[in-house]
């Protein structure tokens, strides 16, 4: 299947410079979806300006959603900015993005993937648990109230 067909279908793929505008829209929608908690995203505007750079990897699923990967240390990475537009929720797009990110992380030699999430993100928390993520100790300095930390052994 060609790249144009994959973009329309929304299959997760590695983002390239041509995806910058879509990624910026998705990231801004992500922040807006967090409500007041979006105020705690330190360095967010710089992240958006640098897209698709600023992360070790960004995956995009057409204009349906995105997810990013950031190195924590030699063997650990962090899932960041998973976002699926409301119209695409419940279609499996989020699961596909995460599974693709996990594949890339394993191929990159990572043995653990971390993420942080908020109690208000109930569906996301359920999805993470269904994929094997478990609660873990704090691994970053996220200042958001009530933030929860999870990990997946890869």
Q: Can you annotate each of these PLM segments?
A:
Residues 1-7:
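Actinobacteria-biased recognition of intrinsically disordered, low-complexity terminal regions
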Residues 85-91, 119-120:
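Active-site acidic-Proline motif in GNAT/NAT acetyltransferases
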Residues 105-117:
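Conserved GNAT acetyl-CoA-binding A-motif
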Residues 91, 95, 99:
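Residues forming the Rossmann-fold NAD(P)(H) cofactor-binding site
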Residues 42, 114-122, 129-150:
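Conserved catalytic-core motifs of GNAT/GCN5-like acyltransferases
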Residues 2, 148-154:
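Terminal substrate-recognition subdomain of acyl/acetyltransferases
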Residues 97, 121-124:
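Conserved short alpha-helix immediately C-terminal to the canonical SAM/SAH-binding motif I
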């Amino acid at each position: 299947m060609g790249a144009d067909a994959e973009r329309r279908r929304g299959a997760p793929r590695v983002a390239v410079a041509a995806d910058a505008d879509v990624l910026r829209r998705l990231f801004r929608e992500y922040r807006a979806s967090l409500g007041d908690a979006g105020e705690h995203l330190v360095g967010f505007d710089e992240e958006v300006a640098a897209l698709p750079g600023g992360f070790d990897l960004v995956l995009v699923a057409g204009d349906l959603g995105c997810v990013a990967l950031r190195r924590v240390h030699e063997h650990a990475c962090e899932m960041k900015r998973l976002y699926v537009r409301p119209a695409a929720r419940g279609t499996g797009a989020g699961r596909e993005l995460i599974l693709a990110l996990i594949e890339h992380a394993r191929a990159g030699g990572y043995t653990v993937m971390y993420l942080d999430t908020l109690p208000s993100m109930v569906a996301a928390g359920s999805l993470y648990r269904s994929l094997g993520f478990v609660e873990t100790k704090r691994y970053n300095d996220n200042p958001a109230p009530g933030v929860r930390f999870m990990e997946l052994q890869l």
